[in-house]
Amino acid sequence: MISNIGIIKGLVREFYQTRMVVRIDNDDLEPFFLTKGKLVAFDCEEFDLWNKPYKLVCKMTQDKLESLCVGCKIARVLFLVFQPTGHELQMTDMESLHLVNKSFETVTWGIGSWHEDSVRLVTLVEVVSQ
């Protein structure tokens, strides 16, 4: 059985099509997933932070989520922030967001300053069958 970690690593590698690999601590990530849930889709955005305020804002509409998860109940949404370091993507922050009655809030990170000029935000949607 493929673990959630394996799925994430494979999806992100396939998405980027680069030499970068994803380093994720299994202990950090696994508690954010429901045991009966599964990942069905993810979205990725790159943010240029060079000479700009170090703040990251993610906005996801309910329509977009529903289009990604047709026929499934959304259990949880997980946001991962990756910082490029050499040929790796180091996970620097994450947030797990429960959806209640189809409500969805904006998630904002204060990233702090570093020498890299961009970060990537990966949005993972965990669902359970209806």
What feature does the model see in each segment?
Residues 1-130:
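Tubulin/FtsZ superfamily GTPase core signature
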